[in-house]
Each structure stands twice: as structure tokens, then as C-alpha cells.
UniProtKB/Swiss-Prot annotation:
<dbReference type="InterPro" id="IPR016164">
    <property type="entry name" value="FAD-linked_Oxase-like_C"/>
</dbReference>
<dbReference type="InterPro" id="IPR015345">
    <property type="entry name" value="Cytokinin_DH_FAD/cytokin-bd"/>
</dbReference>
<feature type="binding site">
    <location>
        <position position="167"/>
    </location>
    <ligand>
        <name>FAD</name>
    </ligand>
</feature>
<comment type="function">
    <text>Catalyzes the oxidation of cytokinins, a family of N(6)-substituted adenine derivatives that are plant hormones, where the substituent is an isopentenyl group. Catalyzes in vitro the oxidation of various types of cytokinin nucleotides that are known as direct products of cytokinin biosynthesis. In association with CKX5 regulates the activity of the reproductive meristems, flower organ size and ovule formation.</text>
</comment>
<feature type="signal peptide">
    <location>
        <begin position="1"/>
        <end position="31"/>
    </location>
</feature>
<feature type="binding site">
    <location>
        <position position="106"/>
    </location>
    <ligand>
        <name>FAD</name>
    </ligand>
</feature>
<protein>
    <recommendedName>
        <fullName>Cytokinin dehydrogenase 3</fullName>
        <ecNumber>1.5.99.12</ecNumber>
    </recommendedName>
</protein>
<dbReference type="InterPro" id="IPR050432">
    <property type="entry name" value="FAD-linked_Oxidoreductases_BP"/>
</dbReference>
<feature type="binding site">
    <location>
        <position position="172"/>
    </location>
    <ligand>
        <name>FAD</name>
    </ligand>
</feature>
<dbReference type="InterPro" id="IPR016170">
    <property type="entry name" value="Cytok_DH_C_sf"/>
</dbReference>
<keyword id="KW-0732">Signal</keyword>
<feature type="binding site">
    <location>
        <position position="182"/>
    </location>
    <ligand>
        <name>FAD</name>
    </ligand>
</feature>
<feature type="binding site">
    <location>
        <position position="511"/>
    </location>
    <ligand>
        <name>FAD</name>
    </ligand>
</feature>
<keyword id="KW-0560">Oxidoreductase</keyword>
<dbReference type="InterPro" id="IPR016167">
    <property type="entry name" value="FAD-bd_PCMH_sub1"/>
</dbReference>
<dbReference type="InterPro" id="IPR036318">
    <property type="entry name" value="FAD-bd_PCMH-like_sf"/>
</dbReference>
<feature type="binding site">
    <location>
        <position position="102"/>
    </location>
    <ligand>
        <name>FAD</name>
    </ligand>
</feature>
Length: 523
């Protein structure tokens, strides 16, 4: 056993050295192959394009703060098209990078492939197939290119639903499973990656494998939250439950951050309480659209604005309880008891009763409104963080009441809500803090093409504050410009991440836009 452990350690050290050398050695453009020249193969005729419109579209994402151009775009009609392309790259002396792109909701070019090939996953969506629901086993098999809203529509037809969601449903299944998939349900049901039973994955060697916690388990756990580094998900089996009919939706306003967080932490500690919990902040210099949604009655807008002006920063707690015919007579009593137990500002409690679908798809209304005003396809210099519970008060003082107020440029929602670590799985690749409770903090900014750099600068100021204060903050939907940043990001799990990369994508072909590894070519 001792000899085995020594050999394992030596192998891991060797792998790490190879990766470090590769990362520190720039690959010049004259050695980088051009996929359009390489892929003059009949099997890709009509499926691979280098048209200016296709390349431009693949270079642009939701973030609109960077453009990274591929040489070509693959428009696959089957999984085999993707497998063949990866095999071709892997077997080539000069391999080319390749990235899967779903709905393009990355914010920093993470789904790009400079001088490589971007795979348009949505081209494989077939309305006549791709989603299969098992009512007896309570799962849905879905092609990874489908959007979560499409999955929801299909499962609701049978009275079933997945239990873990993102706030925005127009994201692909494969995209969120490669990152984590979080929202206000995470504290109770876990992120989307912990609600997966099985997947089909194409590795960086062009091999397709079915994996689960019991079959090819290392690949299964590597891919979930793995930022696309180990394989492209083509199918996922998602857990389902009986769908509720409606949602009792409450919001409470706070002026004291400690009471706000204490109430949040108490609510998420209950095993059978609310189904959804999120928090957010309001600042006195923020645009009214940050909070003047249709949720708050117009008659209260002046009251809320006055409180925001007086306190400069206030906090909103949002909770939801799902119900149906069997619980419709008890849900009001449960929510009334919850309201009485909270330390919110009295007189500032708001309530709505909506359908389950309308609640889950609530962001869509805002999206359509912004699109109608030409304010959707704009820069989104987002920053998403995981902050340990013991550091959240320091974060409030230094960031919410410090950097944010001082810079006076807030635009877009700022979320802050806790999650339970025991709902995550350490075998998966996603990086999270070590504490039992940690907070998701999201600066979901919108900016102009002429001023987004100011928001980006503020993001860097926030990150520097957290680093200088040694807060143990970890980025979600991460972006790091150097290998050192990624080593810090994964911490003690970095060596495992490197070993898995070497195992499943040894030529560093997949997802180069994450900027974690550089590709390795044969000599």
C-alpha cells in the first residue's frame, strides 16, 4: 500500500510539472493549426462553416465585454459529428482547440475557442425527440442542448418538475451542469449538479461514455461543475418530483444586515420550511428599475425610496413556498408564522400568489422588457462570489457599505443569499468554501459599451478587498487571467483537477476560453 501511494504521488507530481511547463510556455500563432485548413474532410461538408456571420456570432456572448474569434463553427446534426471532430483534433500532430456553446450566456468568453472550432450545440435540438420523461422512475432524459425552460414545459405536461433551478431558465442543460446551477432553491435541494443521475459525455480524446455515480464515476464527478474541461455533456438524466401548482411569494425589507443574515440562516436551517430563499440589496444611488418591478405596489414606491434614501443601503429577503390542492389551506398559516418570526421592518412585507411556472420564469418578463428598449444585448460585467458565512458581515461593511456606495455606479441587481454546504458534493469539480454555510453574492450588472470598464474596475476592487482581508472568497462562474489564479481558486483540489484533465483531455483541447490550460501538441 505504501509503495502504491508513493507511485501515485510521483505520478501526480509529474503531471503537475507537465501542466505548469505547458502553461508557462506560450504557443505562437505560427504553430497553431487553422481548423478550416485541417478540416477539409468530406464528413464535415455542410457542417463546418467559417462564414463571417457564424464566426462573429460565436465570438460574442452575453457578457459583451470581449470577443474571441474561432476559425470555424461546427453545426452538428448528431453526437457523432462532435465525436469525429474531437477525434480528428486529438489524432492530429497539431491539434486545434474546441469549445461547446449552448445559449451563449457566458460573460467573459468562457465558451470561446480562439483559432479553433466552436460547436453550436443548439443546432442538435430536435423538437420531435431529445426529451424523454419517466413517470415511474421520476427522471427526465434530455439532450444537453435543450434549454431548461423547454425541459420545464415538457415535464409539466406530465405534472412533474426538476427541483433545482437557475433564476434564468433560457440556459442549456449542459451549460449549467458544467458550472453548478444555483438559485434560491439551492439551500434545500442542492445545485443542479447534485440533481443529476446519469450523463453521456464526449471526452477530449473523442471517446463517448455513459457515466453516473456508479459507472465511470470519476468522469461523472469531474464533468459536473468542471467548466467544460473534461468533456462535452450530450445527455443528462435529471431527477424529478411531482410539480406543485402555485407559489406563495413574499418579500421583506430590512435595515439591519445582521438581522437580515440571521433570519436567512435560520430559515435555511429548517428541513421542511420554504422552497426558495434569496436576498438582495437596494442602494440609494441605484436606478429605480433595480427594485421598482411589478412586484412592489406603485403606492409604496415613495415609501420604499424614502427608506433607501435614509439608510443608503437596505436589504430584501425573498421567500417562496410552493403548494397545491393538498396544502392550499395550510400555506397561508405557515407563511404568516414565518413572517411573525422574522425581524424585518414592520409594514414592509409584500405578498404575491402566482402559478409555479410564472414564478420560475419570472426573469423572462424583465428580459423582454429590456429587449424592447434595446437594453438586453449590452455589456454585462458580472461578478459572482461565494463568501463564507463568517466573512459576510465584513463583506457588507467593506463592499456593500464601502466600495459600492463610494463608487456610486451600481446598475443591476445585487444578490446575497446563503446555501448549505451539505447539499453539495465534494467529489464534483465545483469549488466552494469550506464552511457549513456560505453566501452567494452576485453583482448582475448592465452597462454601456462606453462605460463597462468602470464596472470591471469595481469588480477588481472588490476582489482585491476580499484577497487583502483573507476572506476565503471563491468566484462562481469564475474568470482568472493566470494559472496562479486558478490554483488559488481550486486550492487543495487543484492537483485532482490537473490529474483529471490529463486523464480525460491530455492535449488540452476542450474549453480553452476558460483560460485554465494551454493545449499540448505533438512534436
Amino acid at each position: 500500500m505504501a509503495s502504491y501511494n508513493l507511485r501515485s504521488q510521483v505520478r501526480l507530481i509529474a503531471i503537475t510539472i507537465v501542466i505548469i511547463i505547458t502553461l508557462s510556455t506560450p504557443i505562437t500563432t505560427n504553430t497553431s493549426p487553422q481548423p478550416w485548413n485541417i478540416l477539409s474532410h468530406n464528413e464535415f461538408a455542410g457542417k463546418l462553416t467559417s462564414s463571417s456571420s457564424s464566426v462573429e456570432s460565436a465570438a460574442t456572448d452575453f457578457g459583451h465585454v470581449t470577443k474571441i474569434f474561432p476559425s470555424a463553427v461546427l453545426i452538428p446534426s448528431s453526437v457523432e459529428d462532435i465525436t469525429d471532430l474531437i477525434k480528428l483534433s486529438f489524432d492530429s500532430q497539431l491539434s486545434f482547440p474546441l469549445a461547446a456553446r449552448g445559449h451563449g450566456h457566458s460573460h467573459r468568453g468562457q465558451a470561446s475557442a480562439k483559432d479553433g472550432v466552436v460547436v453550436n450545440m443548439r443546432s442538435m435540438v430536435n423538437r420531435d425527440r431529445g426529451i424523454k420523461v419517466s413517470r415511474t422512475c421520476l427522471y427526465v432524459d434530455v439532450d444537453a442542448a435543450w434549454l431548461w425552460i423547454e425541459v420545464l414545459n415538457k415535464t409539466l405536461e406530465l405534472g412533474l418538475t426538476p427541483v433545482s433551478w437557475t433564476d434564468y431558465l433560457y440556459l442549456t442543460v449542459g451549460g449549467t451542469l458544467s458550472n453548478g446551477g444555483i438559485s434560491g432553491q439551492t439551500f434545500r435541494y442542492g445545485p443542479q449538479i447534485t440533481n443529476v443521475l446519469e450523463m453521456d459525455v464526449i471526452t477530449g480524446k473523442g471517446e463517448i461514455a455513459t457515466c453516473s455515480k456508479d459507472m465511470n464515476s470519476d468522469l461523472f464527478f469531474a464533468v459536473l461543475g468542471g467548466l467544460g474541461q473534461f468533456g462535452i455533456i450530450t445527455r443528462a438524466r435529471i431527477k424529478l418530483e411531482v410539480a406543485p401548482k402555485r407559489a406563495k411569494w413574499l418579500r421583506f425589507l430590512y435595515i439591519d444586515f445582521s438581522e437580515f443574515t440571521r433570519d436567512q440562516e435560520r430559515v435555511i436551517s429548517k428541513t421542511d420550511g420554504v422552497d426558495f430563499l434569496e436576498g438582495s440589496i437596494m442602494v440609494d444611488h441605484g436606478p429605480p428599475d433595480n427594485w421598482r418591478s411589478t412586484y412592489y405596489p406603485p403606492s409604496d414606491h415613495l415609501r420604499i425610496a424614502s427608506m433607501v434614501k435614509r439608510h443608503r443601503v437596505i436589504y430584501c429577503l425573498e421567500v417562496v413556498k410552493y403548494y397545491d390542492e393538498t396544502s392550499q389551506y395550510t400555506v397561508n398559516e405557515e407563511m404568516e408564522e414565518l413572517s411573525d418570526s422574522l425581524n424585518h421592518v414592520r409594514g414592509f412585507m409584500y405578498e404575491k400568489d402566482v402559478t409555479y411556472m410564472d414564478f420560475l420564469n419570472r426573469v423572462r418578463t424583465g428580459e423582454l422588457n429590456l429587449k424592447s428598449k434595446g437594453q438586453w444585448d449590452v455589456p454585462h460585467p458580472w461578478l459572482n462570489l461565494f463568501v463564507p458565512k463568517t466573512q459576510i458581515s465584513k463583506f457588507d461593511d467593506g463592499v456593500f457599505k464601502g466600495i459600492i456606495l463610494r463608487n456610486n455606479i451600481t446598475s443591476g441587481p445585487v444578490l446575497v443569499y446563503p446555501m448549505n454546504r451539505n447539499k453539495w458534493n465534494d467529489r464534483m469539480s465545483a469549488a466552494i468554501p469550506e464552511e457549513d454555510v456560505f453566501y452567494a453574492v452576485g453583482f448582475l450588472r448592465s452597462a454601456g459599451f462606453d462605460n463597462w470598464e468602470a464596472f470591471d474596475q469595481e469588480n477588481m476592487e472588490i476582489l482585491k478587498f476580499c484577497e487583502d482581508a483573507n476572506m476565503g472568497v471563491i468566484q462562481y462562474l469564475p474568470y482568472h487571467s493566470s494559472q496562479e489564479g486558478w490554483v488559488r481558486h481550486f486550492g487543495p483540489r487543484w492537483n485532482i483537477f490537473v490529474e483529471r484533465k490529463y486523464k480525460y483531455d491530455p492535449k488540452m483541447i476542450l474549453s480553452p476560453g476558460q483560460n485554465i490550460f494551454q493545449k499540448i501538441n505533438s512534436s
